[in-house]
């Protein structure tokens, strides 16, 4: 988003591509996690659990579509302070979807619902979406430390077993290498330059938010329903913790360094603001 605001890769729609693909990646991760969670922690046959998980996914998708269309057209565009109202409505809807999915047994499906809701509403809004995004970003900056703080509180570095850490780091490294290579090969058919393909492949490396949300969910479910599986749930937390610690800062650093060097800058926001202020004075 910072690169987009500064005009890098805008003409090629690279920031939009990265955010859209990230949403689809999160969608796949949440769906797969919910399916595995149902199979591991809940009683019944594997087929029944898989069907129940798919049912929950369908309910989440349907709820996200309905809420998305609601937010698209309400409040109406003729109202005052429409951006502020839309921003708070989106935040309330997101929080309600996540918290409301827990009491009705749709564990983890709230995140899937918010992703679909976010996609549906964003396709309607044009000029206001960046302003609404700014409001959500400011709120996220407040709650983000709490989310990652909870993950860090559940993982005791002194109690981490060396073999678990080694296996986790090796698995993450292998997965990242395969991921980066596959993305680069796919971008070869999309018409991007060599530098742009390298940047896009590396920009998909960071993993943090989804891992921070789903990791504690597995541990919480194990503590409540199946305490004998708590050890394995802690291993999941360890992998999530290492994924955040390794990929998030390094990915952000690479994007910050390589973005201005590998992407074409099509406009300078500071110059545009200066020109607008000059026109207003005249």
UniProtKB/Swiss-Prot annotation:
Q: List the subcellular locations.
A: Membrane
- Which GO molecular function entries does the Swiss-Prot or TrEMBL record give? antiporter activity
Broad class of where this protein is predominantly found: membrane
Instruction: Kindly list the GO CC terms recorded for this protein.
Output: membrane
Name of one Pfam family that matches: Na_H_Exchanger
Offer one example of a GO biological process linked to this entry: proton transmembrane transport
Q: How does it sit in the membrane?
A: Multi-pass membrane protein
Keyword line: Membrane, Transmembrane, Transmembrane helix
The membrane-spanning stretches of this chain are: 27-47, 51-71, 87-107, 135-155, 174-194, 198-218, 239-259
Family, according to the entry, reads as follows: Belongs to the monovalent cation:proton antiporter 1 (CPA1) transporter (TC 2.A.36) family.
Give the matching PANTHER family. PTHR31102, SLC9B1-LIKE PROTEIN SLC9B1P1-RELATED (PTHR31102:SF5)
**Name of the protein described by the UniProt record:** Putative SLC9B1-like protein SLC9B1P1
Q: Which organism is it from?
A: Homo sapiens (Human)
Its organism's taxonomic lineage begins at:
Eukaryota, Metazoa, Chordata, Craniata, Vertebrata
């Amino acid at each position: 988003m910072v690169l987009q605001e500064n005009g890098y890769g805008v003409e090629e729609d690279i920031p939009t591509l990265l955010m859209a693909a990230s949403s689809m990646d999160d969608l796949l991760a949440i769906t797969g996690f919910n399916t595995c969670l149902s199979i591991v922690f809940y009683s019944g046959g594997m087929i029944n659990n898989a069907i129940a998980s798919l049912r929950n996914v369908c309910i989440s998708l349907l709820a996200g579509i309905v809420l998305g269309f609601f937010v698209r057209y309400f409040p109406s565009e003729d109202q005052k302070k429409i951006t502020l109202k839309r921003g708070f409505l989106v935040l309330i809807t997101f929080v309600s979807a996540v918290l409301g999915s827990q009491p009705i047994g749709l564990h983890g499906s709230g995140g899937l619902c918010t992703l679909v809701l976010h996609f549906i509403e964003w396709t309607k809004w044009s000029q206001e979406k960046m302003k609404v995004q700014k409001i959500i970003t400011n709120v996220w900056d407040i709650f983000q430390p709490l989310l990652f703080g909870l993950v860090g509180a559940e993982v005791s570095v002194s109690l981490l077993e060396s073999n678990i850490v080694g296996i986790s780091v090796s698995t993450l490294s292998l997965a990242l290498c395969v991921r980066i290579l596959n993305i680069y090969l796919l971008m070869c058919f999309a018409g991007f330059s060599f530098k742009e393909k390298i940047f896009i492949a590396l920009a998909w490396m960071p993993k943090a938010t989804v891992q921070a949300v789903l990791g504690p969910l597995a541990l919480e479910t194990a503590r409540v329903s199946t305490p004998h599986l708590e050890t394995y749930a802690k291993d999941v937390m360890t992998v999530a913790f290492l994924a955040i610690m390794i990929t998030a800062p390094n990915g952000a650093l690479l994007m910050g360094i390589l973005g201005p060097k590998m992407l074409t800058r099509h406009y300078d926001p500071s110059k545009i603001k200066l020109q607008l202020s000059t026109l207003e004075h005249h």
